[in-house]
UniProtKB/Swiss-Prot annotation:
PANTHER family: D-XYLONATE DEHYDRATASE (PTHR43661), D-XYLONATE DEHYDRATASE YAGF-RELATED (PTHR43661:SF3). Gene3D superfamilies: IlvD/EDD C-terminal domain-like. Binds 1 [2Fe-2S] cluster per subunit. This cluster acts as a Lewis acid cofactor. Keywords: 2Fe-2S, Amino-acid biosynthesis, Branched-chain amino acid biosynthesis, Iron, Iron-sulfur, Lyase, Magnesium, Metal-binding. This is Dihydroxy-acid dehydratase. [2Fe-2S] cluster binds at C122, C195. It is an enzyme of class 4 (lyase). The lineage of its organism: Bacteria, Pseudomonadati, Pseudomonadota, Gammaproteobacteria, Enterobacterales. Mg(2+) binds at D81, D123, K124, E491. Its cofactor is [2Fe-2S] cluster; Mg(2+). The gene is ilvD.
Length: 616
């Protein structure tokens, strides 16, 4: 029978000092012996996805206390990728994932907490907390802040839905008037919550459902809706049950590594492919799997991508649907239900509610459930009122979207495409693979061949695109932007958005060892591995070289002879200390970022730290 971890600090005469300090936080004699549960919040006023979280930790804590536990809250940092985008701030985004994971480990282990409730939401916060949870392997429940409502505005006498990406594209399009750009900017992000499309934040919050570590509805129920409050209340109650099951009944099924098993990771990736999630999810699932000591690799993702169809299409891949529409169609469980009927899921998995996948679908799949409360929850909709307050409205759709032939979520028979929304490509300059969000690629450019235009920074590429130096048919290559080379593996949302604003969204390709925002669409291929700074062949591409992309056949090729590539590699090595570094880039890199770069691995490994360099 495992002992409560917290007993280390609450029991024994020699722990009098620790108990004295616990008493100063409000604990009393009756609390010593109860499980101490960390409420890991991520409130910040910098990020709309987190601006409403200040009081939500208190909601969880009250339920923990009422259920027989002791709640202790702390905060992590949270970077807003959209605000950090397009300047040096983006260098810090991915490294913040590691800082978040470490800070959770530090706080939980330093104070011997027994379990956690993780209140996350945006791009690197959910992955960082997920990595920490699987590293620590103590009972945990995730509950995120929820998606933002889609923006709406009237253009050309037509009401259209908007999101952050629309504001970026219109702001860079010289054909758009200042008045229209301003109108879109003011309408794009109307409420608190994670940006309203199937971007990285919402993708990851959906994946925690598929992993079994969060409750049904977590990924899609709007931040503003009153129904979301119940997820927080339930999390506080349920975590005490999970904690007591493990520590008092020796039930290891309550631990995250036994919930988020290899089978659960495969289900999560299957969901990701079917819903056309952000390419960043690949990076984060690979990293989380390593923390869980699960053998889950790019090869597994490649195999899944070849058999899973696309059953859901959401912004940025279409403007018709946003997360509020996914929720109306049944959310994550709606997609999982269709995947299950197609025989594409591992059914022998459980979630934090203790339900197997078939049991969960029976209760929460809107096409089969008899539970009217569940149907009501999935009718939760937007109010269209600007607010930063959680649970501030109770609007509902008149009906559910259960049309699996022409609705937001489709059945296998009516899939958007037989190929899924993500694909792994391999070739002679991506020997370890690269990732493309096929959900956002127009059918006309699934096969694309063109001359390379090579840039050694995102900034140079943006200048060239806006300056008209990139033309129809070009393959833009942005290198030395990987985890080590950036450092920090910047997102390339601005280059892809600016290609669209210049009318080149379906006429060019963009390839990088960096990564893309979940808001990216178009022929945007990232995570090229090995990266340029690690000796990757992408560093040897020159202007004018022909690159051939063949998504249906999962191929990407630099059309040069092996002899020519070998000669260029030899010339690169001859640069000595300057080999595998950008030639003409001026970039200030802080000590913190240099420390990150010194241990960073390529994207095919999840851009985690290289344990072998630390003797691990």
């Amino acid at each position: 029978m495992p002992k409560y971890r917290s007993a280390t600090t609450t029991h024994g005469r020699n722990m009098a000092g620790a108990r004295a300090l616990w008493r100063a936080t409000g604990m009393t004699d009756s609390d010593f012996g109860k499980p101490i549960i960390a409420v890991v919040n991520s409130f910040t006023q910098f990020v709309p996805g987190h601006v409403h979280l200040r009081d939500l930790g208190k909601l969880v804590a009250e339920q923990i206390e009422a259920s027989g536990g002791v709640a202790k809250e702390f905060n992590t940092i949270a970077v807003d990728d959209g605000i950090a985008m397009g300047h040096g701030g983006m260098l810090y985004s991915l490294p913040s994932r590691e800082l978040i994971a470490d800070s959770v480990e530090y706080m939980v282990n330093a104070h011997c907490a027994d379990a956690m409730v993780c209140i996350s939401n945006c791009d690197k916060i959910t992955p960082g907390m997920l990595m920490a949870s699987l590293r620590l392997n103590i009972p945990v429940i995730f509950v995120s802040g929820g998606p933002m409502e889609a923006g709406k505005t009237k253009l050309s006498d037509k009401i259209i839905k908007l999101d952050l990406v629309d504001a970026m594209i219109q702001g860079a399009d010289p054909k758009v008037s200042d008045d229209q750009s301003n109108q879109v900017e003011r309408s794009a992000c109307p409420t608190c919550g994670s940006c309203s499309g199937m971007f990285t934040a919402n993708s990851m919050n959906c994946l925690t459902e598929a992993l079994g570590l969060s409750q049904p509805g977590n990924g899609s129920l709007l931040a503003t809706h009153a129904d979301r409050k119940q997820l927080f209340l339930n999390a506080g109650k349920r975590i005490v049950e999970l904690t007591k099951r493990y520590y008092e009944q020796n039930d290891e099924s309550a631990l995250p590594r036994n919930i988020a098993s290899k089978a659960a990771f495969e289900n999560a990736m299957t969901l990701d492919i079917a819903m056309g999630g952000s390419t960043n999810t690949v990076l984060h699932l690979l990293a989380a799997a390593q923390e869980a000591e699960i053998d889950f690799t790019m090869s597994d993702i490649d195999k899944l991508s070849r058999k899973v169809p696309q059953l859901c299409k959401v912004a940025p891949s279409t403007q018709k649907y946003h997360m509020e529409d996914v929720h109306r169609a049944g959310g994550v469980l709606g997609i999982l239900g269709e995947l299950d009927r197609a025989g594409l899921l591992n059914r022998n998995v459980k979630n934090v509610l203790g339900l197997t996948l078939p049991q969960t679908l029976e209760q929460y799949d809107i096409t089969v459930t008899q539970d009217e409360a569940v149907k009501k929850m999935f009718r939760a909709g937007p109010a269209g009122i600007r607010t930063t307050q959680a649970f501030s409205q109770d609007c509902r759709w008149d009906s559910l979207d259960d049309d699996r032939a022409a609705g937001c979520i489709r059945s296998l028979e009516y899939a958007y495409s037989k190929d899924g929304g993500l694909a792994v490509l391999y070739g002679n300059f991506a020997e370890n693979g690269c990732i493309v969000k096929t959900a956002g690629v127009d059918d006309s450019i699934l096969k694309f061949t063109g001359p390379a235009k090579v840039y050694e920074s995102q900034d140079d590429a943006v200048e060239a695109i806006l300056g008209g130096k990139v033309v129809e048919g070009d393959v833009v290559v942005i290198r030395y932007e990987g985890p080590k080379g950036g450092p920090g593996m910047q997102e390339m949302l601005y280059p892809t958005s600016f290609l669209k604003s210049m009318g080149l969204g379906k006429a060019c390709a963009l390839i990088t060892d960096g990564r893309f925002s979940g808001g990216t669409s178009g022929l945007s291929i990232g995570h090229v591995s090995p990266e340029a700074a690690s000796g990757g062949t992408i560093a040897l591409i020159e202007d004018g070289d022909t690159i051939a992309i063949d998504i249906p056949n999962r191929s990407i090729q630099l059309q040069l002879s092996e002899a020519e590539i070998a000669a260029r590699r030899e010339a690169q090595e001859a640069r000595g200390d300057k080999a595998w570094t950008p030639k003409n880039r001026q970039r200030q890199v802080s000590f913190a970022l240099r420390a990150y770069a010194s241990l960073a691995t390529s994207a095919d490994k999840g851009a985690v730290r290289d344990k072998s360099k630390l003797g691990g």
